Amino acid sequence: MEQPPEDQGPQREPYNEWTLELLEELKNEAVRHFPREYLHGLGQYIYNTYGDTWRGVETMIRILQQLLFIHFRIGCHHSRIGIIRQRRLRNGSSRS
């Protein structure tokens, strides 16, 4: 019969503490890539919609993660991560 593991390892920090640290890291990264006015408007929208709740914090984290992912995927000029679009040569010299 299957038994649960006896040792779960070291206890993780509380969820709320970890969540707030994650939000702070995402905000710090977002201000390096997006206009402050845009981020302020997003924060106001989240606050007006969810108030000062954990649901609002989780929503803000999800939106910032999505924005940063798309930003890097498109090709951020501040990062080496992303798609580097190469110009196609019309003379056919790149063909083998």
Swiss-Prot record:
One of its GO terms (biological process) is regulation of DNA-templated transcription. It comes from Human immunodeficiency virus type 1 group M subtype F2 (isolate MP255). Homooligomer, may form homodimer. Interacts with p6-gag region of the Pr55 Gag precursor protein through a (Leu-X-X)4 motif near the C-terminus of the P6gag protein. Interacts with host UNG. May interact with host RAD23A/HHR23A. Interacts with host VPRBP/DCAF1, leading to hijack the CUL4A-RBX1-DDB1-DCAF1/VPRBP complex, mediating ubiquitination of host proteins such as TERT and ZGPAT and arrest of the cell cycle in G2 phase. The modification Phosphoserine is found at S79, S94, S96. One of its GO terms (cellular component) is host cell nucleus. The gene is vpr. Keywords: Activator, AIDS, Apoptosis, Cell cycle, Host G2/M cell cycle arrest by virus, Host nucleus, Host-virus interaction, Ion channel, Ion transport, Modulation of host cell cycle by virus, Phosphoprotein, Transcription, Transcription regulation, Transport, Viral penetration into host nucleus, Virion, Virus entry into host cell. Residues 1-42 are annotated as: Homooligomerization. Its main location: virion. This is Protein Vpr. Phosphorylated on several residues by host. These phosphorylations regulate VPR activity for the nuclear import of the HIV-1 pre-integration complex. Belongs to the HIV-1 VPR protein family. It comes from the Viruses. HIV-1 lineages are divided in three main groups, M (for Major), O (for Outlier), and N (for New, or Non-M, Non-O). The vast majority of strains found worldwide belong to the group M. Group O seems to be endemic to and largely confined to Cameroon and neighboring countries in West Central Africa, where these viruses represent a small minority of HIV-1 strains. The group N is represented by a limited number of isolates from Cameroonian persons. The group M is further subdivided in 9 clades or subtypes (A to D, F to H, J and K). It is found in: Virion; Host nucleus; Host extracellular space. During virus replication, may deplete host UNG protein, and incude G2-M cell cycle arrest. Acts by targeting specific host proteins for degradation by the 26S proteasome, through association with the cellular CUL4A-DDB1 E3 ligase complex by direct interaction with host VPRPB/DCAF-1. Cell cycle arrest reportedly occurs within hours of infection and is not blocked by antiviral agents, suggesting that it is initiated by the VPR carried into the virion. Additionally, VPR induces apoptosis in a cell cycle dependent manner suggesting that these two effects are mechanistically linked. During virus entry, plays a role in the transport of the viral pre-integration (PIC) complex to the host nucleus. This function is crucial for viral infection of non-dividing macrophages. May act directly at the nuclear pore complex, by binding nucleoporins phenylalanine-glycine (FG)-repeat regions. Transmembrane segments: none annotated. Pfam families: VPR (PF00522). InterPro entries: RetroV_VpR/X.
